[in-house]
Amino acid sequence: MTPVNAKHYLHDDIIRKLTELKLAELSDYVDELCADPECVNLDFIGKFEVITNRLYQNRINELIKNLLKNATLREPQASIAGLYYEAERLLSRELMIELGTCDFMRSQTNIIIEGPTGAGKTYIACALAKAAVGKCYRVKYIRLPDLQQELEDCYHYNRSLKNLKQKYTRPALLVIDEWMMRASSDSLSSFLLDVMEGRYTTSSTIFCTQSKQESWHAMLGGNTMAEAIIDRIVQNSLTITLGNLNMRALRNPLMKYKNVKE
């Protein structure tokens, strides 16, 4: 009989097989289970359920960790629970709690967050994005100026434009920050049309912007391509318009608002 490893309850051969199956952590779970007095009286099925649940939760935690890393959120610490509600801010607690369930993604609804600089648009978007990550959705955050730079680099260094399109078409939730802060180039507008077309009716996008929607048409070129981009965004969208409360000022430690989380 194969000897039992002095450090483990399972035989060395079983541990080797688990490792080959990419289930090496099961050996540790068995050790912990056998050492737990509360699990001594569990039958086989009970112990199997404990180990399976532990393995499943560990894999989910690792998945969420990797998804959050790949999301490249500007504010990865953001959360729905950390949102600040003040009458002057015009932000609905009920709406944010509802959006935090990520049900809007099932209907491929886009969210447009409008507000002046410092209103906390990025934090809200990242809070929703992090909620989506917590439900194991693939998420990506990008500033539009950075996306434009990536596109220019693609052309300059002859990189794959197809790969760049897939990078922003595939995520279940895409966050585009600093949307329409300046006029778009023809190449960027063309790229945005391809991305929006690829995401239309399949996934959701969050736009953070200081610009009113009425100004987008001119900033996107004032042509039929601009109309096509806007149509794919706004036809199935929800707009959150924030007030003039400056969240950066509230986060300043010199201000009297000491309990502001956002």
Where are the predicted features?
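Walker A/P-loop nucleotide-binding motif
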Residues: 108-124
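Loop/turn-to-beta-strand initiation segments
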Residues: 136-138, 170-173, 200-207
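Interdomain "pre-motor" coupling segment immediately N-terminal to P-loop NTPase/helicase cores
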Residues: 19, 23-75
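Post-Walker A helix-loop "phosphate-sensing" segment adjacent to the P-loop in P-loop NTPases
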Residues: 130-142
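N-terminal pre-Walker A segment at the start of P-loop NTPase domains
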Residues: 78-102
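Charged, compositionally biased N-terminal leader segments and the immediate start
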Residues: 1-21, 25-27
